[in-house]
Design a protein with these regions (language model features):
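A cross-family "folded-core" feature that marks the main globular domain of proteins
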Residues: 1-425
């Protein structure tokens, strides 16, 4: 309801919304009343023209989605059970301050959506989350990434400063350079994996045996002790396989240097990157663009493809950032977007991935954000508009207006002034 109104700049009739959303007018009117009374993010305006949403200052659909994640009983229920496996149903109802019958109805309804969309459910005897383990972990990577800011660390039993130190030292072992965003993502993935592993839930994936052995042999005693004290688990091969999954897959290269070396020695990597390079060069050629950091972009895209279902930023729970990013690119640079969309769909077939909108948008975001100097090039390639300024006061007034316009629009316009008395064409 809210997303439909947000994506439409015009007034929408209630009957039109009812048809689009497959929902009765009566229910929509009830929702409208509740939303306008209970939320301060927006006002849903009503008139004889229909309905229209008006967001309040510093509010948006994104802030609305974030508020839902914070306040929704359904998401609170999932989080409580994830962090407290085997909790009794009565304890959950007490924490949510709802009756047992209401809780059971909520779980029954929620399980239908969870099974259909994520291939797992909530079991109530006692409470636990069961199903496809990889999908369970990926869901909660994405959930905690979208719901909590870095400073709002939700895992109370794992000290954030200790977690930062552990992640920092693990990175140092592999000599991996990292930024704030990547560091935060690794923290979330590791802690989600810890909660599942602690409760005897395992994933079975290929791993880089050499890397596992390196970590076992090169982790010093002080760090090993800190890990075992923090997680209350023995630091051994199983711990590494379950906690550091997916970063120890054999297809993952932790530095661009490792990746470039693999192109020279690994036939499969060489073949894949050749196809990727061709796609990127085709996009650049079609749009009259240079691609100065092609090797870096190949490395990032290759990594994104293999880590896609382990990277929380590749999907979403409520707010689809990649979709809105791609939509904005389509609006601002339609020719580039068409090339990217076609190219990224082809890119997904190289990795045997489904050509989904979510996956394609994730690849588009990755390319646009990592392509060096892309936005300046696109603006330079735009046709410039010729502007002639004529003043009916004096020539210096025309020069002043030229300076004002140049300040606001920069190189987008070619501006001239004239003092001629003949303005006929």
């Amino acid at each position: 309801f809210i997303e439909t109104l947000t994506n439409n700049d015009d007034w929408m009739l209630l009957a039109e919304l009812s048809s689009l959303l497959d929902c009765s007018k009566r229910i929509l009117k009830m929702d409208l009343r509740y939303l306008n009374e209970e939320l301060d993010d927006f006002t849903i305006l009503t008139s004889n023209k229909g309905l229209k949403i008006d967001y309040h200052p510093n509010r948006s659909f994104k802030t609305f989605c974030h508020k839902l994640l914070l306040l929704s009983d359904s998401y609170r229920l999932l989080e409580i059970i994830f962090l407290n496996e085997d909790i009794k149903v009565k304890e959950v109802s007490d924490q949510l301050d709802i009756s047992l019958s209401t809780l059971y109805r909520m779980i029954e309804k929620l399980n239908i959506d969870l099974k259909e969309n994520y291939d797992f459910i909530i079991d109530t005897g006692p409470c636990r989350i069961v199903g496809d383990e990889e999908k369970i972990r990926f869901f909660f990577y994405t959930y905690f990434f979208e719901k909590y800011r870095h400073a709002n660390w939700p895992f109370e039993e794992i000290n954030l400063e200790t977690m930062n130190a552990l992640t920092d030292e693990f990175m140092a072992i592999k000599n991996v350079s990292y930024d704030f965003a990547y560091f935060n993502i690794v923290n979330i993935v590791v802690v989600v994996n810890y909660f599942r592993y602690r409760n005897n839930h395992y994933v079975d994936m290929k791993n880089n045996q050499r890397l596992v052995e390196d970590l076992l042999q090169n982790t010093d005693e002080a760090l090993r002790h800190k890990i075992e004290t923090t997680f209350e688990l023995q630091f051994n091969k199983d711990f590494i396989l379950q906690i550091l999954n997916p970063f120890i897959q054999p297809e993952i290269y932790h530095t661009e240097k490792e990746f470039i070396a693999a192109i020279e020695t690994n036939c499969k990597v060489n073949l894949i990157t050749d196809k990727m390079r061709t796609i990127l060069k085709t996009i650049a050629l079609k749009n009259n663009l240079s691609l100065p950091n092609v090797d870096s972009l190949l490395y990032i895209l290759y990594s994104a493809a293999y880590l896609e279902y382990s990277q929380p930023q590749s999907r979403y729970i409520l707010f689809d950032r990649n979709h809105y990013f791609s939509t904005e690119i389509k609006k601002q640079f339609p020719t580039l977007y068409n090339s990217l969309y076609e190219g990224m769909q082809e890119m997904r077939t190289i990795f045997d991935k489904p050509e989904t909108e979510a996956g394609t948008n994730f690849f588009i975001f990755t390319v646009v954000s990592w392509w060096e100097n892309l936005i300046p090039q696109l603006h330079q390639n735009h046709y410039k508009v010729n502007v002639l300024i004529v003043s009916d006061r004096h020539p210096k007034h025309a020069e002043m207006m030229k300076n004002f316009i140049q300040f606001e629009f920069g190189e987008k316009l070619i501006i001239e002034t004239t003092t001629t008395s003949d303005l006929s064409y």
